[in-house]
């Protein structure tokens, strides 16, 4: 895995955004069970501080979720790593992300060499994310739409990653998953959620596995500008 040169240049930080601080975060993730070195290396390289408000930059490499406005958050790095590790186990080439948010998870996936399609229902967040993608030289296909309907034009996907919680897994998204593909999503209520891994096996069957308890914002229908 080789990140774009422009991304590596932008990744240089100082003080609480320095490489030393990022290395500490990566070691914490490793201690907390993240094993895929490709994922850890990508988290070390991708500059999380550029995906949040400048006022929060000093907290960028804490292992915690942070607000990005509009009632949304940039996910905790451990959660990003865990979800990414889960989808990477099926060696995907093309992935659909539901909920672009800040664009950080999208950037992680693209920097791993995946062909990324991402959908965001809040127009302002998507415009900000697109600007970051351009600045970092990352190629990501994005769409302003209701994420719960997926993106059928480019289906099927080897992996689907959902970054907001619904009460159940969404059939429309499962239908867009390729044979041998994997969907990872938080499922549950506002007070109780779990990260669920769904795999469509080679013979076409569906298997489910509960990975971890998590807390995500709710997956909402419709679109906002």
UniProtKB/Swiss-Prot annotation:
This is Protein-L-isoaspartate O-methyltransferase. GO terms for cellular component: cytoplasm. GO terms for molecular function: protein-L-isoaspartate (D-aspartate) O-methyltransferase activity. Belongs to the methyltransferase superfamily. L-isoaspartyl/D-aspartyl protein methyltransferase family. Its main location: cytoplasm. It comes from the Bacteria. Its EC number is 2.1.1.77. It catalyses: [protein]-L-isoaspartate + S-adenosyl-L-methionine = [protein]-L-isoaspartate alpha-methyl ester + S-adenosyl-L-homocysteine. It is found in: Cytoplasm. GO terms for biological process: methylation; protein modification process; protein repair. It comes from Xylella fastidiosa (strain 9a5c). InterPro entries: PCMT, SAM-dependent_MTases_sf. Keywords: Cytoplasm, Methyltransferase, S-adenosyl-L-methionine, Transferase. It is an enzyme of class 2 (transferase). PROSITE patterns: PCMT. The active site is at 75. NCBIfam families: pimt (TIGR00080), PRK00312.1 (NF001453). Signal peptide: none annotated. Catalyzes the methyl esterification of L-isoaspartyl residues in peptides and proteins that result from spontaneous decomposition of normal L-aspartyl and L-asparaginyl residues. It plays a role in the repair and/or degradation of damaged proteins. PANTHER family: PROTEIN-L-ISOASPARTATE O-METHYLTRANSFERASE, PROTEIN-L-ISOASPARTATE(D-ASPARTATE) O-METHYLTRANSFERASE.
């Amino acid at each position: 895995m080789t990140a774009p040169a422009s991304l590596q240049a932008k990744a240089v930080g100082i003080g609480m955004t320095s490489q030393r601080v990022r290395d500490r975060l990566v070691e914490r993730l490793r201690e907390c069970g993240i094993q895929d070195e490709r994922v850890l290396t990508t988290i070390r390289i991708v500059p999380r501080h550029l995906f949040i408000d400048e006022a929060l930059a000093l907290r960028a490499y804490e292992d915690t979720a942070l607000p990005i406005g509009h009632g949304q958050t940039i996910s905790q790095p451990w959660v990003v790593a865990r979800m990414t590790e889960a989808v990477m186990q099926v060696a995907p080439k093309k992935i659909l992300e539901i909920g672009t948010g800040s664009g950080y998870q999208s950037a992680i996936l693209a920097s791993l060499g995946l062909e990324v399609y991402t959908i965001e229902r809040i127009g302002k967040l998507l415009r900000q994310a697109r600007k970051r993608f351009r600045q970092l030289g990352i190629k990501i296909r994005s769409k302003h739409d209701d994420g719960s309907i997926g993106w059928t034009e480019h289906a099927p996907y080897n992996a689907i990653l959902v970054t907001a919680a619904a009460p159940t897994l969404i059939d429309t998204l499962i239908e867009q998953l390729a044979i041998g593909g994997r969907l990872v999503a938080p499922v549950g209520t506002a007070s109780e959620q779990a990260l669920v891994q769904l795999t469509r096996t080679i013979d076409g069957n569906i298997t489910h596995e509960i990975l971890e308890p998590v807390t995500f914002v709710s997956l909402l229908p419709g679109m906002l500008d």
